[in-house]
Amino acid sequence: MKILIAAIVFSVIVLSHELGHFLLAKKNGITVIEFSLGMGPRLLSTERGGTRYSLKLFPIGGSCMMAGEDDDDTSEGSFNNASVWARISVVAAGPVFNFILAFVFAMIITSVMGYDPPKVLQVTEGSPAWEAGLREGDVITEFQGKNIVIGRDLDSYMTLHGLQDETISLTYKRDGKKQDITFRANSESKYMLGFHYASEGEPEILQVMLNSSMQKAGVQAGDIIREINGVEVKDSAQLQDYLKEHPLDGSEVKLGIERNGKLETISAKPQMTKQIDSGFVYNVYREKTNFLGVIRYSATEVRYWISTTIESLAMLVKGQFSVNDLSGPVGIIDVMGDSYEAAKKEGAVMVSMQMLYWAILLSANLGVMNLLPIPALDGGRLVFLLVEAVRRKRLNPNVEGMVHFAGFVLLMLLMVFVMFNDFRRL
């Protein structure tokens, strides 16, 4: 079932992307030879208005094949016969349509589920945050210099960056008035493995912290702890009791991890970690909003995923993420399947919302990735077209073709590497 759902989600996202290229090509008088969904041999095909419309065997990818797109053809109706700005609009339309699709899906989710206001749910009385004036019900609008619109903006900051320093600066709104505060949070250093697990039931790992001992040992969210230092663990309460009785002291810890029904043993050495307590708890739950709010927060939803994708890419370039952390279609399908299984317990509406949520994430992600200035991607083609617009002369087509081919080969090698990692993690 999860493969079918993932295929539908991927197909809709790719169809939207290729539809953008298709509509702008038609608008600019460029002949579209074939518009297809999927890859491989054709299952269904029909020709209308000089364009062949095809459904292909493998529901991954798609294409909008335009006349003269990859050669020197400058005859009437060919891609190269169109003006440079017409070609720029055609190439850019794919990613733009991905953002539009993400916005449409975000409107559905926000209409049904609402948005997550960045409200303060609780402030520890007597903490530095309390002494600085922060109270329950305040709405955070800025945190450590980052603009905050929804609760997940705060959540994203905490996940990607954490609190690196005890000094916290934030802006909150109360009764329509904004107030800036700065306080020095409480902190303590202790040995930690770097993970969060479910508070009840099976001790399933919910999150593995970046650059932690657990991440380096290969532990993943979704793994279940069955043993710790040879002691059997039946539930989260038992794991919690063990850790209270045997505080981590820097000695190596052996864990029995269950993944997809298979048990494996890993070793991880706790690291001395400074824990900074902000002194307050913020909201990540959704609440209803009015029509204008739906529009505003739907745009915010798309902006959130675009900025999160860009920030994650920047961290990858800086070495804060490893290429081993990347997931391809196989890994995404697996995680989507887990989301589906969790959501179906709450009914069809929640399943629909969860899959739309994934569609927003993936559509925004695809839009950003395609705009990267990498040969063979839309962004790489846009670079050549913008240079042509400035020079008022096209670059050597053979050189451009070789650059895009080299980029395509490198992307395929990266895809093989990522898929290998996906299968290794299953």
Mark where each language-model region is:
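Juxtamembrane boundary at the C-terminal end of a transmembrane helix
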Residues: V416-L426
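Juxtamembrane extramembrane loops of integral membrane proteins
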Residues: E69-D70, G77, A82, L121-S187, ...
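Internal alpha-helical transmembrane segments
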Residues: F58-E125, A406
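Terminal peptide-recognition signature
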Residues: H17, L55, G94, A129, ...
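PDZ/PDZ-like domain segments forming the peptide/carboxylate-binding groove
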Residues: F103, I109-E142, K146-V149, E188-E227, ...
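Alpha-helical transmembrane segments of multi-pass membrane proteins
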Residues: F10-V14, M65, N98, A102, ...
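Functional transmembrane alpha-helices
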Residues: S78, A82-W85, M192-K216, A221-E227, ...
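Small-residue-rich helix-interface/hinge motifs
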Residues: K2-S75, M369-R391
